[in-house]
From Swiss-Prot:
Record bears the keyword Nucleus: yes
Alphabetized InterPro entries for the sequence: LSO1/2
Main location: nucleus
Subcellular location: Nucleus; Cytoplasm
Protein's organism: Saccharomyces cerevisiae (strain ATCC 204508 / S288c)
Protein name in the entry: Protein LSO1
Biased composition annotated in UniProt, kind: Basic and acidic residues: 25-49, 57-73
Gene null: resulting phenotype: Mild slow-growth phenotype in response to reduced iron levels.
Gene Ontology terms describing biological process: intracellular iron ion homeostasis
Induction: By iron starvation.
Signal sequence, renumbered to the chain: none
Length: 93
């Protein structure tokens, strides 16, 4: 404590108030740092989310294009079979 010749009871309130103030300031400083870190982390996540993976996009495009082409082929084949009839043996006499 202080060695100024004052009694403990005279300085105890000031010392306690000073310690409490320092604790409060340290707590507020920690909270501010945590908020800043969270903001930085959120910003990094947003930056990462903005740029999609080009390779995956190209793969997805190719996949959808293949599926579309297959559906078209199946439709054409079904229409052709329908136009020709079932085929089979033909008429029996």
């Amino acid at each position: 404590m202080h060695n100024t010749g004052k009694r403990y009871s005279e300085t105890a309130k000031k010392v306690a108030a000073g310690r409490a103030r320092k604790r409060r300031q340290a707590y507020e400083k920690d909270q501010l740092e945590k908020q800043q870190l969270e903001a930085q982390e959120a910003q990094r996540w947003e930056e990462g989310a903005r740029t999609p993976n080009q390779k995956k996009l190209i793969m997805e495009q190719k996949k959808t294009e293949k599926l579309r082409a297959k559906k078209e082929r199946d439709q054409l084949l079904a229409a052709e079979e329908e136009a020709l009839g079932k085929g089979g043996r033909g008429k029996r006499y």
